[in-house]
């Protein structure tokens, strides 16, 4: 028997925003496994808003930095792992509405679900307020990352870093293959294998787009190669 979820008013305190339309927050915390009124459209909206706000903040902070470094810094800040870390810090798993299958498999701890919930909250706050309000909320959430981040190779995305690591070791480039897709065309979940020469089993990654799944698989490969170096 699952424990009752805390009231969403507690979540409002955590995220730093009080909703006029409580239904938006409820929808943002509802996974597609739990209801047909789920958070994926809000996630889509929040993803775009988050990217814009972080891009604008980096553009203003680094007036002389080239586009490539700006893109890499933005990718590092808004990547799935970064969003999942924020979602865990907020305790979003305690507030999520999940179907029985996801509950049994520990979906409230899954990084992809937590990251999607963060983006859905952003979309919900935007619809409940305006661009200025959500901009300030996002800047408050990501203030530590925006303060510490600097241009450089450490901000390159996982696929780029994996490619450079393999090239440095004089190995062929990795190969990415989509091995499974779930869901309908507008809300699919992708599973990708990343194959590296000399390693028998491919590295798996999942995500709501092929690109996200490839980055997740590349991250798994990087971690293995760095640990075994």
Swiss-Prot record:
It catalyses: Endonucleolytic cleavage to 5'-phosphomonoester. Residues 8-130 form the RNase III domain. Residues 157-227 form the DRBM domain. It holds the Pfam family Ribonucleas_3_3. Keywords: Cytoplasm, Endonuclease, Hydrolase, Magnesium, Metal-binding, mRNA processing, Nuclease, RNA-binding, rRNA processing, rRNA-binding, tRNA processing. GO terms for biological process: mRNA processing; regulation of gene expression; rRNA processing; tRNA processing. Mg(2+) binds at residues 43, 116, 119. It is found in: Cytoplasm. One of its GO terms (molecular function) is ribonuclease III activity. One of its GO terms (cellular component) is cytoplasm. The active site is at 47, 119. Its main location: cytoplasm. It is an enzyme of class 3 (hydrolase). Residues 201-229 are annotated as: Disordered. The keyword Metal-binding applies. Disulfide bonds: none annotated. Digests double-stranded RNA. Involved in the processing of primary rRNA transcript to yield the immediate precursors to the large and small rRNAs (23S and 16S). Processes some mRNAs, and tRNAs when they are encoded in the rRNA operon. Processes pre-crRNA and tracrRNA of type II CRISPR loci if present in the organism. Homodimer. This is Ribonuclease 3. It comes from Idiomarina loihiensis (strain ATCC BAA-735 / DSM 15497 / L2-TR). The lineage of its organism: Bacteria, Pseudomonadati, Pseudomonadota, Gammaproteobacteria, Alteromonadales. The gene is rnc.
